[in-house]
Amino acid sequence: VFNHVGRGFWAFKDVQEKKWDSPYKDWFHISFDGNSNYNDGFWYEGWEGHFELVKLNLRHPDVQHHIFDCIRQWKDEFGIDGLRLDVAYCLDKNFIRALRGFCDSLSPDFFLVGELLHGDYNQFVGDGMLHSCTNYECYKGLYSSMNSYNLFEITHSLLRQFGPENWTLYKGKH
């Protein structure tokens, strides 16, 4: 998961210890004007309100470099050829663009799949963004159509995502 870390992450532990003097304080969304639920002496943004999961500042270049170095190591050591990005709907779109550029530089075949629970999938998938994504909206519609013979959900989802015109799936891709 690239948008948050646990409270035990080494860079966050450094911030807990050194506060303002930590070189990692800008790796997170922190305010020294408040206090966390854990009485850290500063407030920080937790992922979707879960303060045991500290949200990373994905716009900070050092955070991006750290993540990209991890990906490079995984590719070199384990031979990975793609990533499934958990909670991709929470990722900063500029970060996704930077991630795609980095991964393309590793290998033109490196594949990025994002977990998207809701929203406009087209904002996350395409040239310079993710290659593909999970589509739970259509999954639910397909499940209902197959198991309860309810075609309304899948019809609604497909029309909402792709529009009523024929061949919409191929728009701009020929």
Predicted regions and their residues:
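A cross-domain feature marking catalytic cores of carbohydrate-active enzymes
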Residues: V1, V5, V87-Y89, G114-L116
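Conserved alpha/beta catalytic core and glycan-binding cleft of carbohydrate-active enzymes
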Residues: G6-K19, E45, I71-R72, I96, ...
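Short linear motifs at secondary-structure transitions and domain/linker junctions
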Residues: I30-G34, D40-F42, V87-C90, F110-F111, ...
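The start of beta-strands in P-loop NTPase/AAA+ ATPase cores
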Residues: G79-D81, F110
